[in-house]
Design a protein with these regions (language model features):
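Interdomain/boundary linker segments immediately adjacent to catalytic/signaling cores
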Residues: 1-63
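Non-catalytic C-terminal interaction segments of nucleic acid-processing enzymes
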Residues: 2-30, 136-219
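A conditional alpha-helix N-cap/helix-loop micro-motif detector
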Residues: 49, 72, 111-112
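Amphipathic coiled-coil/heptad-repeat helices and related helical stalk/stem segments
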Residues: 53, 75-77, 114-115
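Short phosphate-binding/catalytic loops that engage adenosine nucleotides
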Residues: 64-65, 127
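A structural signal for short, well-ordered beta-strand segments and their strand-loop junctions
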Residues: 68-69, 91-93, 130-133
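Active-site beta-strand-loop-beta-strand hairpin of nuclease catalytic cores
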Residues: 75, 79-100
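Catalytic cores of nucleic-acid endonucleases
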Residues: 96-159
């Protein structure tokens, strides 16, 4: 653990991002920065993920949100970004595409199931749920989450649940959580330039669909 290097890196990114914020909003980003430093001391975060969280937090603060990171929202769930504005709550989960060695032989299915499970589990704890990813990655967004709950077919919900059940058993993902899940947006994060751009889910799928189809990935 190199606390000095971590602190220097998050301070550097915070200073860079603060240039785009109003003076009275900079303290909100500094609060997030200090949260991350304290969590690093407890070995709860890593620098690559922390930088992504800072960029997403800056985007939300710019739009009037108050932001916390690594916040517990249930007995088993800790979200990356938890933001409040007025009476509404936003959760952002950042996906980098990492998969553990245990799933070296089923990486695509595992990754898709993780995305499905996050949408199903986290979206019930907020008014708006979003996924975020570095610009180098592509998220396989299941088509079912582009539809409102009343337009989702039972066989499509069952298909998502069957895949999730392969990887999530304790506890399993509930049928009702998949049926009622909602995905508000996708954030594309440019780490080098320090910004995140928000896309609606349908727009993101339209942009990435042909690449995923070439790779024979469809959920």
């Amino acid at each position: 653990m190199d606390l000095e290097k971590f602190r220097n890196d998050v301070y550097e990114m915070t200073e860079k991002l603060s240039k785009n914020l109003k003076e009275n909003d900079r303290s909100k980003l500094n609060y997030v920065c200090q949260q991350l430093i304290e969590m690093y001391k407890k070995n709860l975060v890593k620098i690559n993920h922390s930088v992504l969280e800072l960029i997403c937090a800056s985007n939300l603060i710019l739009r009037g949100y108050s932001v916390e990171v690594e916040k517990s929202v249930s007995d088993i769930l800790v979200c990356d970004i938890y933001a409040k504005k007025g009476g509404g709550y936003t959760i952002i989960e950042i996906e980098t595409g990492f998969t553990p060695p245990d799933h070296a032989m089923d990486t695509v299915d595992y990754y898709a199931a993780r995305i499905m499970s996050k949408i199903a589990r986290y979206s019930q704890h907020c008014s708006k749920f979003s996924l975020a990813t570095p610009v180098m990655g592509i998220l396989p967004i299941p088509k079912i989450f582009l539809l409102p709950p009343n337009a989702r077919k039972k066989e499509d919900v069952d298909k998502v649940k069957e895949l999730c059940d392969r990887y999530y058993k304790n506890p399993p993902i509930k049928y009702e959580d998949i049926l009622n899940a909602h995905l508000h947006s996708i954030y594309l994060i440019n780490i080098d330039k320090g910004f995140a751009k928000e896309l609606d889910p349908q727009g993101y799928v339209d942009l990435t669909q042909s690449l995923l189809e070439r790779s024979e990935i469809e959920y």
